Amino acid sequence: MEEPPQEALAEPLKHESPAAPSSAGHTKGQEEDDQKNQAERKADNHTAHRIADQTALRVPSQAESSIFSQATNGVAEQNGHSTPGQAGRRASNPADVSDLRADDQVNQTPSEQTKGKASSQANNVQHEQSDGQVSGLTEERTAEQTERRLPTQAERRTSGQIDGRLAMPSDQRGSRQTDHRMAGQSERRASEQMDRRMSGEAERRTSEQITHRLSKLSERRPSVQIDSGSSVPSDQSPSVQIDSGSSVPSDQRPSVQIDRRMSGKVRRRSSEKTDYRLAGLADPGTSEQTDLRLYGLVDHKTSVKTHHQVYGQATELAEHQAIDQAHSNADQPPVDNAHYTESDQTDHLADRQANHKDQLSYYETRGQSEDRIFPQLGNSKEDKEADYRVQPCKFEDSQVDLNSKPSVEMETQNATTIPPYNPVDARFTSNFQAKDQALFPRLPSISSKLNYTSSQEKTQAIVTKSDEFSEIDQGKGYHIRNQTYRRFPSIVYEDPYQVSLQYMEKHHILQIFQQITENLVYEKPEDPLNFMLCQV
C-alpha cells in the first residue's frame, strides 16, 4: 500500500488543531485494538515457527531449499517497498520475515497515529489498509502452510509406500533365497543319505550273490578236476595240480574286481536314477554281468581241461617227442666253442649216425614184436591185404636226416630201382601220320604229341624197397644183421583223361568226326542224321 503524502496530512492538522483533544479517546481504543492485533500476530508467528521447525525436520534438504526459496520470493514480491537489508534477512530465515513485517507495521502505526490525529478519516483509512495487509499476510501464510503440509504429507505417504514396497520385495527375496537354500541343502542331504543307503544295499546284495556263485563253482571244479586227473599223463599232472592250486586265489581276485566294478556302476546309477528304480535294476544288471564273467571263466577252464584230456590220450607221441628232442639236442654241434676243429665235426657226425641207427633198430624190433603178436590174435586174409595197401607214412623231423649217409643211399637205391618210362607216343605217331596222309589228304594233320612229364610221374608204378641198414653197436656188441621192411606191391595210377585221349588217338575218332562234319556242311542235306550214318 502507498503511504499518504506528508504535506496533505500536515494541512488538515493545521486546520484541525483545535479539535485534537476530542480524538484522544479514539486513539486509546485504537491502541488497544492494535495491541490485540499484535498479540494475535505473535501467536500466529509462534505457530508458524513450530510448523516450520517440524517441516524442516521431516522434509529432506532439497525440499527445504525449494520451499525456503519460494517463501523468500513470495515475501519479496509482497513487500516491494522493504529495504534490501530487510529482504536479505527475510530470505535468510522465514521466521524473521514474519517478525520484520510485524515490526514494520507497528512502527508505521504510531507514525500514522501521530500524523493522523487531526483527521479521523485518514486514520480510519490507514487502519483499514493495515488490517487488509495483516489479513492478506495471514491468509497467505495459512495458504503457504497448507500447501507445505499437503506436499509434505504426500511426500511422506509416497516415501513410506515406496519404502514399504522396496522393503517388502527385498525381504521377500531374502526369505525366498534362504528358503530355497535351506530346502536345497535338506534335499541334498536326504538324497545323499538315500544314495548311500541304496548303494550299500546294492553292494551287499552283489557281494552275497557273487560269493554264493563262486562257492557253487568251487564245489563243481574239484569234481571235474578229479575226473580229468586220471586221463592226464604224468608229464602234465604237475601243471594240472598247479592250476588247481592257483584256482582259489584266481577266483578271489575276479570277485574283488567284480565287486569294485559293480559298486562303481551302482553308484553312478544311484546318482542318475531314483531310489526305487535302482532297487529294481541293480540286482538284475549286476547278476547278468557277474553271470557272463563267471561263465566265461568256467568255459575257459573247461576248455583247458578238455585240451589236457585230448593230449592225455596221446602219451606215446609225447614220449617220442621227448626222446627226439633229447637226440636233437645231443646232435647239435657245440657252436659256442671257439676251438671247434674238424676232428670234433667228424666225431659229431659219427654220433649222429649211431643215434640214427639206434632209432632204426628200435622201430625194427617194435615191428617184429607186432608181427609176432598179430598172428597170435588170428588175423584174417582181409587184414593181411589191408596191411599190404598203401598207407600214409608220417615222419617227424628228428627221424629224417637229409645229411645222413643212409638217407642218401636210400635215395640212390630208389632212383636205380625205378624203371624208365617209355611213352606211347612213339608207337602212334609214325602209324598215325601215314594213315592220315593216305585216308584224309584234305584234312589238316592233328598233332598227337603231348607232354607226358606229369603223366610219367602219375602212371609210374612206384616200387618201394626197404634199404638194408646195418646196425652196429660199439659198446654193447650187437650183431650186424640185414633186415628188410615190408615190401609193398606196385601201384599203377592211370589218369582217365589220358586213357580217353589214348583211345581216341588209337581209333582216329577226331579225324572221323572232322570228315563227317566237313561233308555235312558242304552238302547240307535235309536229313543230317541219316547222312551221318551213311558216312560211317
Swiss-Prot record:
Q: List the residue ranges of the region (Disordered).
A: 1-287, 328-348
Keywords, alphabetical: Cell projection, Cilium, Flagellum, Nucleus
Stored Pfam families: Tex55
Intracellular or extracellular location(s): Nucleus; Cell projection, Cilium, Flagellum
Q: Where is the composition biased (Polar residues)?
A: 62-85, 105-136, 243-255
Determine the domain of life of the protein's source: Eukaryota
Q: Where is the composition biased (Low complexity)?
A: 1-11, 226-242
Q: What is this protein called?
A: Testis-specific expressed protein 55
Gene coding for it: TEX55
